[in-house]
Swiss-Prot record:
Organism: Drosophila melanogaster (Fruit fly)
Tissue expression profile of the protein: In testis, it is present at high level in hub cells, a niche for germline stem cells of testis. Ubiquitously expressed in all testicular cells throughout spermatogenesis. Ubiquitously expressed in all germline and somatic cells of the ovary.
Gene3D superfamilies: YVTN repeat-like/Quinoprotein amine dehydrogenase
InterPro entries in the cross-refs: Trm82 (IPR028884), WD40/YVTN_repeat-like_dom_sf (IPR015943), WD40_repeat_dom_sf (IPR036322), WD40_rpt (IPR001680)
GO cellular-component term (any): tRNA (m7G46) methyltransferase complex
Residue ranges of WD repeats: 96-137, 184-223, 227-265, 324-364
Protein name in UniProt: tRNA (guanine-N(7)-)-methyltransferase non-catalytic subunit wuho
């Protein structure tokens, strides 16, 4: 089971199990929620090619409940889709209680929310999320479980990558249009970017590669950013020509992705499995946050600065313990002053808040009982709730096999036996 957490001004979006919560980062109060219906109403799909499927999105129900919002508005249920969306009356593939939230992404204009699901019903759900209630626009089936989501800069379409390396484009205007297969990798894609001018799609995978693909002519690869020696777990767009990447090879790097040129390589204390970047000064100063794999410090905060001659440097480093070792950390997000971290404690979901300046647990502005309220909202405290065991990230690392040593040992024994026979 996955837990997703992200910050989209002015709210934290938290997905777990069958629910998505919208939380006010200031007082940690829930002011809106979405619950997946038992049946997503997928009619099934026909094959468009061996890699692609047409998505005939049909009936689905969206339950969106608004809590006590910051403005004090009452809760409301949003069970009906918007005009032009899908109806809630048709039947689909049947009840699939194991279906759960996989990935969540907000559109740049803040109007749309994309949710992918895993389990028996793999789907891309598109919601109209603002101004108040979340209303379902479409539910389109996915051939495989998703690995990453990314909206384009004008929110007109969304990219979905899956765990076999394929990348599909879904239209957010014609919400029932079938997907378009854009590109493919030979291994799982962990993150994806779409440049602001929509001229390039940037993907990273388990095979150490960062690929820059031209759009819309995605058969044409513009460049590669090569140098990582392990999986590339995260990407972040810095400027029109620069990206940051984090990898299991214990490095944080900055690239000119147009030229495929590495501009900075910074050593990390442990493999990196998540990367987030905040802009502090436009196109000049950034804060990169890295989640480590099995290290005494859970996160590293790095200040990236760009000089006038286009050189990059790390000018400040802060390591955040976040009580690593006492619980299994799975994900995190940042605001201007706090770090929000999700994980498992005794196989139960937990959420902790830390001060971004000190790295210590946040003390001010955290109401009593907030954690129980959030966990109740996600259904994590319900009777019969399944245990929460974060993804085993050890499978991300390459498996290296040494059959040369065995061969040399056998050869050595054979030579010794031949020499003994000659002497005998």
């Amino acid at each position: 089971m996955c837990t997703t957490i992200s910050f989209a001004e002015p709210e934290i979006v938290l997905g777990h199990g069958r629910r998505v919560l919208f939380v006010n980062p200031d007082d940690l109060q829930i002011f809106k929620e979405i619950e997946l219906p038992p049946d997503l109403g997928l009619k099934g799909h026909t094959s468009q090619s061996q890699e692609s499927c047409t998505a005939a999105a049909a009936a689905s129900t969206a339950t969106a409940a608004s809590g006590q919002a910051p403005g004090g508005k009452e809760q409301q249920l949003a069970n009906q889709p918007e005009e032009g969306g899908t109806s809630a009356s048709a039947s689909g593939l049947g009840c699939a209680t194991s279906t759960s939230v996989q990935n969540v992404a907000y559109s740049p204009d803040g109007q749309l929310l994309a949710v992918t699901t895993s389990g028996k019903q793999k789907a891309l759900l598109l919601y109209r999320s603002r101004p108040e209630n979340a209303r379902l626009l479409s539910a389109r089936p996915l051939a495989r479980a998703s690995s990453a989501l990314r909206f384009c800069s004008d929110s007109s379409s969304i990219l979905v990558t899956d765990k076999t390396g394929d990348c599909y484009q879904y239209d957010c205007v014609e919400v029932e249009a079938p997907p378009r297969l854009l590109l493919g990798h030979l291994s799982v894609v962990y993150d994806i970017l779409w440049s602001e001018d929509q001229q390039h799609i940037i993907t990273c995978d388990r095979d150490d590669k960062i690929r820059v693909t031209n759009y819309p002519a995605t058969f044409d690869i513009h460049s590669y950013c090569l140098g990582h020696r392990e999986f590339v777990s995260g990407l972040a767009l810095l400027t029109e020509q620069h990206i940051a990447s984090a990898s299991g090879d214990k490095t944080l790097r900055v690239w000119n992705y147009i030229q495929g040129k590495e501009l900075l390589q910074h050593e990390l204390p442990a493999p990196a499995v998540r990367l987030l970047v905040r802009q502090l000064e436009p196109e000049k100063v950034f804060q990169a946050a890295v989640l480590f794999y099995e290290h005494v410090d859970a996160l590293g905060l790095y200040r990236l600065e760009r000089s006038s001659d286009d050189t990059w440097s790390v000018t400040a480093t802060q390591l955040v313990c976040a009580e690593a070792g006492s619980w299994s950390i799975s994900n995190f997000t940042l605001t201007s002053d706090r770090i929000y971290i999700t994980g498992a404690e005794n196989e139960r979901l937990s959420l902790r808040v830390y001060d971004i300046a000190t790295g210590q647990p946040a003390s001010s502005g955290v109401p009593e009982g907030w954690l129980k309220m959030v966990l109740d909202g996600l259904g994590a405290n319900e009777e019969g709730a399944p245990p929460f065991i974060p993804e085993d990230l050890s499978v991300w690392f390459k498996k290296r096999f040494d059959n040369v040593s065995d061969y040399l040992e056998r050869k050595k024994r054979r030579i010794e036996e031949q020499q003994q026979q000659k002497c005998g």
